[in-house]
Curated annotation (Swiss-Prot):
<comment type="similarity">
    <text>Belongs to the pseudomonas-type ThrB family.</text>
</comment>
<protein>
    <recommendedName>
        <fullName>Homoserine kinase</fullName>
        <ecNumber>2.7.1.39</ecNumber>
    </recommendedName>
</protein>
<keyword id="KW-0808">Transferase</keyword>
<dbReference type="GO" id="GO:0005524">
    <property type="term" value="F:ATP binding"/>
</dbReference>
<dbReference type="InterPro" id="IPR011009">
    <property type="entry name" value="Kinase-like_dom_sf"/>
</dbReference>
<dbReference type="GO" id="GO:0009088">
    <property type="term" value="P:threonine biosynthetic process"/>
</dbReference>
<comment type="pathway">
    <text>Amino-acid biosynthesis; L-threonine biosynthesis; L-threonine from L-aspartate: step 4/5.</text>
</comment>
<dbReference type="InterPro" id="IPR002575">
    <property type="entry name" value="Aminoglycoside_PTrfase"/>
</dbReference>
<dbReference type="Pfam" id="PF01636">
    <property type="entry name" value="APH"/>
</dbReference>
<keyword id="KW-0418">Kinase</keyword>
<keyword id="KW-0028">Amino-acid biosynthesis</keyword>
<keyword id="KW-0547">Nucleotide-binding</keyword>
<dbReference type="InterPro" id="IPR005280">
    <property type="entry name" value="Homoserine_kinase_II"/>
</dbReference>
<keyword id="KW-0791">Threonine biosynthesis</keyword>
<dbReference type="GO" id="GO:0004413">
    <property type="term" value="F:homoserine kinase activity"/>
</dbReference>
<keyword id="KW-0067">ATP-binding</keyword>
<dbReference type="InterPro" id="IPR050249">
    <property type="entry name" value="Pseudomonas-type_ThrB"/>
</dbReference>
Length: 319
């Protein structure tokens, strides 16, 4: 979450008259994140989240995201629920941007997750994958392997010494992944961005999963590989086998991986590292300087990519 577009209080008050959520008491921009402009709303009926969808999010995809959250919520997945306007509309417009209000989830995201947090994530991810199997809408992953080359080319427009230093490794990794990427793994709805700032906990129990705006149809095991990247490294970039083992064990208690998924999981983890390295690089050089956003360190994913590139066995991942 983040703030790119500011809103005028009077415009917000008019916008809220379309909803049955009470009168506005206060609102505040939410700093975390990089995709959309988000605000915490406090009304006479409680707290809500207002999202203004910025240009990276296609307006045509918004019904998919909102319907998916409804679908998952109906199946017991703790995720935000869109608030419907009085006339039945789900997506409105505010400050020249598509806008929606969603429910507020209790809990906090964990900056230094422990083993139990990782286990909860493994369980929650598997439950999400199963809950999405009967979702009737679909969305292509617009940040999959076929999109990474274009993203890398856009990063190279910037004259940066580090990009030049590591460019050859990135290009060789792109070529390797494109040549070896699988196309026949179990597929369905994935979150595709289940980082620690998108998962809430209350007393070590997972209480919510948020930010479904990268959700799409792709390999379940790719989503799991993203979580290995996001949850199983320490601040010094060392891979924590105990955390990984707990995450993987809990996931497989609910949705066991088939042999072909196990065969490709290291490759998928390499791909996930490269995907987040490239998107963070792009955002690092292209985020407007006046935006209310904390940019994320792209080189964290350089270290993770190097780790996964040197993994030779499943036991090194935690299986």
């Amino acid at each position: 979450m983040a703030v790119y577009t500011d809103i005028h209080p009077n415009d917000l008050k008019v916008f809220l008259t379309r909803y049955a959520i009470g009168s506005l008491l206060s609102y505040q921009g939410i700093e975390e994140g990089i995709e959309n402009s988000n605000f915490m709303l406090e009304t006479t009926q409680g707290r809500f989240i207002l999202t203004l969808y910025e240009k990276r999010i296609s307006k045509d995809d918004l019904p998919f995201f909102c319907r998916l959250m409804q679908h998952l919520g109906q199946r017991g997945i703790p995720c935000p629920q869109p608030i419907i306007q009085n006339d039945g509309v789900m997506i409105g417009e505010l400050a020249g941007r598509p806008a929606a209000i969603i429910t507020f989830l209790e809990g906090e995201w964990i900056r230094q997750p422990d083993i139990d947090h990782c286990g909860e994530v493994g369980t929650g991810l598997a439950q999400l994958h199963l809950a999405g199997q009967d979702f009737t809408l679909s969305r292509k992953n617009t940040l999959s392997i076929m999109d990474w080359q274009v993203l890398w080319q856009r990063c190279q427009i910037t004259e940066d010494a580090l990009l030049k230093e590591f460019g050859q490794k990135i290009e060789s990794e792109l070529a390797f992944l494109q040549e070896n990427w699988p196309f026949n793994l179990p597929t369905g709805i994935i979150h595709a961005d289940l980082f620690n700032d998108n998962v809430f906990f209350v007393n070590h129990c997972l209480s919510g999963m948020i930010d479904f705006y990268f959700a799409c149809n792709d390999f379940f095991s790719y989503d799991l590989a993203i979580c290995l990247n996001a949850w199983c490294f320490e601040p010094d970039y060392s891979y924590n086998l105990i955390k990984a083992r707990k995450l993987l064990e809990n996931y497989q208690k609910i949705r066991p991986l088939i042999p072909l998924e196990l065969d490709k999981i290291v490759l998928l983890a390499r791909g996930a590292s490269l995907r987040f390295l490239l998107t963070r690089l792009y955002d690092w050089f292209n985020t407007p300087p006046d935006s209310f956003v904390i940019k994320k360190n792209p080189w964290e994913y350089w270290h993770k990519l190097c780790f996964f590139s040197n993994v030779n066995s499943l036991s090194e991942l935690g299986f």
